[in-house]
Amino acid sequence: MQIPSKLKPYYENIAFEQEDSKMIINLGPQHPSAHGNLRLILELDGEQVVKARPCIGYMHRGMEKMAENMIYQEFIPTTDRMDYIAASANNYAYCAAVEKLCGLEIPRRAAVIRMILLELNRIASHLLWLATHALDIGAMSVFLYCFREREYVLDLIEKYCGARLTHSSMRIGGVMLDLPENYLEEMLVFCDKFPNDLKDYEDLLDDNRIWRLRTENVGVVTKEQALNWGCTGVMLRGSGIKYDIRKEEPYLLYNEVEFGVPYATQGDSYARYKVYMQEFRESLKILRQCATLYKDTPPEILATHPEYVSASKEQILTQNYSLMQHFVLITQGLKPPKGEVYVPTESPKGELGFFIHSDGTGRPYRLKARTPSYWHCAFFEEMLVGTYLADVVAIMGNVNIVLGEIDR
């Protein structure tokens, strides 16, 4: 008869030192403030965190391995499920990597439509961040107001692609559809209305004593820490480093529009909140300029390259060669030349990029996603040390992670 061995406590396996004055607790993986299935193992000395370890993997779906068994076009809807709060940002980052691998240049109108989708997506993502972060701290009114405006943004996205969350709105070589009738007019109505809503949020939070106490000098990140831990996006700009990939390595038509790069020097949670609020306004500037750019573009929305992009529906139904080429693309997939490529983009949460290694077949030999939340989550190991347990939830909400792109 086999004698079962006594199981060791979990903390012995992760080399936590045991002292009588210390206590180890689990925050998550099922906890409202974890923003997904995140488990934090915290060692406390009274109320102060002396050691923290993020444990991930509860949402792992093997996306990078799945890509190796899919044709290039087939993987686009899977990218929606990474950062599911900003699906269009994932769609674009992946499509841009494949397009660079193939040497495709997308039409000008497709670039404008992509920019519109990306900036609407950025606003929707930031609104969800502000809503949930405020709710974590106890500001219920802001939560409700943010969701009110977010509904309008999601309605605009739904009017274009038919989906509110998982968009699959882009195609390799361009976009799926042109903008519907009156779309720009509705978007500009939102652009005119939203600044007043932003002022309402700031009136509720900027001088709110509780909000200031819970965010000022809490979760401080120095420049050196931000760089050493690979922080990007607002986590980097909130620490005084004025870096935005849309400015440093412009893609689409970002080099043709005027917008600022908000940043702060304090490095605390309140500074990052102010950067987010200013980013809303910069996105509105970009959307207004995109509405002007769109009117001067020719109507093409997909690149013309039979080897990589299907012809139009009319051509497929009337031309034998287009029908055969479409059949090959759908059954075997496009076949980029051998090589490897990495394309960085500025997603709402930071630098999102895809590395693709092609062996010349219809499926990628290796695909690797560089997601900002993964790096920011790892930073909890240092960022939370020295803080109080009550501030852990506030810091987690402020960092703005999503588990879908951490676990993949």
From Swiss-Prot:
InterPro entries: NADH_Q_OxRdtase_suD (IPR001135), NDH1_su_D/H (IPR022885), NiFe-Hase_large (IPR029014). It is a peripheral membrane protein. GO terms for molecular function: NAD binding; NADH:ubiquinone reductase (non-electrogenic) activity; quinone binding. Transmembrane segments: none annotated. NCBIfam families: NuoD (TIGR01962), PRK06075.1 (NF004739). NDH-1 shuttles electrons from NADH, via FMN and iron-sulfur (Fe-S) centers, to quinones in the respiratory chain. The immediate electron acceptor for the enzyme in this species is believed to be ubiquinone. Couples the redox reaction to proton translocation (for every two electrons transferred, four hydrogen ions are translocated across the cytoplasmic membrane), and thus conserves the redox energy in a proton gradient. This is NADH-quinone oxidoreductase subunit D. The lineage of its organism: Bacteria, Pseudomonadati, Campylobacterota, Epsilonproteobacteria, Campylobacterales. The gene is nuoD.
